[in-house]
Amino acid sequence: MTLINPNIQESNKLKFKDESYLDFNSINGGDIRHDWSSEEIKEILDLPLMDLLWRAQIVHRSYNPGYKVQLASLLSVKTGGCSEDCAYCPQSVHNETTVQPNPVIEVESVLDRARAAKDAGADRFCMGWAWREIKDGNAFDSMLEMVRGVRELGLEACVTAGMITDSQASRLAEAGLTAYNHNLDTSPEHYSKIISTRTYQDRLETLRRVRMAGITVCCGGIIGMGESVSDRASLLKVLATLDPHPESVPINALVAVEGTPMEDLSSIDPLEMVRMVATARVIMPKSRIRLSAGRQQLGREAQILCLQSGADSIFYGDTLLTTSNPEVEADRKLLADAGITANFS
């Protein structure tokens, strides 16, 4: 009895419009590309959904056998009062939202939250500061102390705090920082519609400094901000042509907040997030694809499809910076119902 379709090897090849091929068998064998074109990526995004899910799962199973998922916790250490004008963000001083500037949380309080996150099952603790850029001084010294404390707890430590200098990146590396998050948000073509106070090149320069310091890179974007599918492909192209690829790629869905310029935008179709996650997995096989903000509007079924097709991390806890997130118990049940194991490093 023949159990394996003899045509399966050939069906693992995807033919692009320019007559070139993407061989999924070579991806499984470790052939990691950094020369993707936007056109190729858009063709993957536009595949019939069943084909896309199947092909993404081929890659996902190869690099993540057993569907293990990392649980990460995120704390807003400095909330509100940011001078940037990001159109989606309730923490911007340019947007009239209910978020008020709050003082920086003290070091020991942050470490208490890190201990609680570890006790709840997280093994990565992320800390956010609503800043345009890091400035030297007491606040930065406290950040370094927090990083050291989180690492001493046995957790991975990630920081997101805006632009950074070479010296600051080096000091964070010396403190033991695991990862620095600095998202691109959207495509280069759509970027000017989202923010005017920081250039796309500023963001890429920050990523370069993080990489040069020996810190792993966490970089992704947001969908649902009025961009086209071509914009999504362009964003993924920028990420997938970085060499090496970002170790962590958070994929967010816009959470439209009253008082921001994007308050009236409709929620995305959940399957758009599934497509984005699956495509990211195909083109960045070794990266950790993080299912991030906007999970609540996806529903259980779409979240499970994301986990099946490429996501191998979720943010865990009832708040993501200033937006709501599923309750811990709900996430535990979701993972259990899907037969997914957490955690891994």
From Swiss-Prot:
Gene symbol here is: bioB
Q: Would I find Transferase among this entry's keywords?
A: yes
Q: What is its EC number?
A: 2.8.1.6
Q: Which organism is it from?
A: Prochlorococcus marinus (strain NATL1A)
Q: Does the keyword Cell membrane apply?
A: no
Pathway(s) served: Cofactor biosynthesis; biotin biosynthesis; biotin from 7,8-diaminononanoate: step 2/2
**Keywords carried by this UniProt record:** 2Fe-2S, 4Fe-4S, Biotin biosynthesis, Iron, Iron-sulfur, Metal-binding, S-adenosyl-L-methionine, Transferase
Task: Tell me the residue numbers annotated for binding [2Fe-2S] cluster.
Answer: C126, C158, C218, R290
Identify the SUPFAM superfamilies for this entry: Radical SAM enzymes
Query: Which PANTHER family does the record match to this protein?
Result: BIOTIN SYNTHASE (PTHR22976), BIOTIN SYNTHASE, MITOCHONDRIAL (PTHR22976:SF2)
Domain Radical SAM core, by residue range, is: 67-295
The record's Gene Ontology biological-process terms are: biotin biosynthetic process
Subunit details for this protein? Homodimer.
Q: Which family does it belong to?
A: Belongs to the radical SAM superfamily. Biotin synthase family.
Q: Needs which cofactor?
A: [4Fe-4S] cluster; [2Fe-2S] cluster
Which segments does the entry list as coiled coil?
none
Entry's cofactor comment: Binds 1 [4Fe-4S] cluster. The cluster is coordinated with 3 cysteines and an exchangeable S-adenosyl-L-methionine.
Q: What does this protein do?
A: Catalyzes the conversion of dethiobiotin (DTB) to biotin by the insertion of a sulfur atom into dethiobiotin via a radical-based mechanism.
What is a single molecular function from GO for this protein? 4 iron, 4 sulfur cluster binding
UniProt catalytic activity: (4R,5S)-dethiobiotin + (sulfur carrier)-SH + 2 reduced [2Fe-2S]-[ferredoxin] + 2 S-adenosyl-L-methionine = (sulfur carrier)-H + biotin + 2 5'-deoxyadenosine + 2 L-methionine + 2 oxidized [2Fe-2S]-[ferredoxin]
Q: What is this protein called?
A: Biotin synthase
InterPro entries this protein is in? Aldolase_TIM, BATS_dom, Biotin_synth/BioAB, Biotin_synthase, Elp3/MiaA/NifB-like_rSAM, rSAM
The record lists [4Fe-4S] cluster as bound by: C82, C86, C89
